[in-house]
Amino acid sequence: MKKAVVVFSGGQDSTTCLVQALSRYDEVHAITFDYGQRHREEIETARRLASQLGIAAHKVMDVTMLGELAISALTRDEIPVSFELQDNGLPNTFVPGRNILFLTLAAIYAYQVGAEAVITGVCETDFSGYPDCRDEFVKALNQAVSLGLDRAIRFETPLMWLDKAETWALADHYGHLDTVRQQTLTCYNGIAGDGCGACPACDLRSRGLQQYLADKAGVAARLHQKTGLGEKSGC
């Protein structure tokens, strides 16, 4: 039996990864992290979607110690989310160590349940400049974690080279465009669906959706070229 663990926030990217995993694996688990994020509504969104999609198990882990250590606009309500980069060249929504911790804990969970893969929705095509979303980081951590566990757990990043429009096309390919559009929560201000429309996450999500809706065939063709999915299904 093929098993996978999806790092699941209840947002657009991780929900798209989850619906894809359900088509590829016999048993799918999801793990969600409570790190004291300002958009805490995403945890309840993840719970609701996990139940709705009928996965094998959904684990919510308390990792609020990350919020104590990592000062960010996502862990401090008094720090406004900004479009401007900081002096270090990173957005103020970067949470240092977040994906290091999340992927490591997800791998431990995968070890426990006998899963062969950990799936994460990180991407470096359309992304906010976070260093822990880069392909080279994920591959390096994957090697280290597999060595440390003495088990070949595979980190999968199905969205790594997709832009946001192509990610929308992928959700549509699996018949969940409306689910992702209406029920997921990507907004840094905790508003589901189309969100606040003003934060960087909403801007990226909205631009990708409009590009997809304006040229479904063209975007689906790009998705097909990159993944082998999309074009033939007519999404």
UniProtKB/Swiss-Prot annotation:
Gene assigned in the entry: queC
Name the Enzyme Commission number(s) assigned to this protein. 6.3.4.20
User: Which keywords does the record carry?
Assistant: ATP-binding, Ligase, Metal-binding, Nucleotide-binding, Queuosine biosynthesis, Zinc
Kindly tell me the pathway this chain contributes to.
Purine metabolism; 7-cyano-7-deazaguanine biosynthesis
**Gene Ontology BP, a term:** queuosine biosynthetic process
Q: Which Pfam families does this chain map to?
A: QueC
- What's noted on cofactor binding? Binds 1 zinc ion per subunit.
The entry's family comment says: Belongs to the QueC family.
Q: Does the keyword Acetylation apply?
A: no
Q: What is this protein called?
A: 7-cyano-7-deazaguanine synthase
> Which PANTHER family would you find in this protein's record?
7-CYANO-7-DEAZAGUANINE SYNTHASE
A GO molecular-function annotation:
ATP binding
Q: What residues bind ATP, as annotated? A: F8, S9, G10, G11, Q12, D13, S14, T15, T16, C17, L18
Residue sites binding Zn(2+) per the record = C187, C196, C199, C202
Query: What is the enzyme's main class?
Result: ligase
- Please give the function described in this protein's UniProt entry: Catalyzes the ATP-dependent conversion of 7-carboxy-7-deazaguanine (CDG) to 7-cyano-7-deazaguanine (preQ(0)).
Q: Does the keyword Protein biosynthesis apply?
A: no
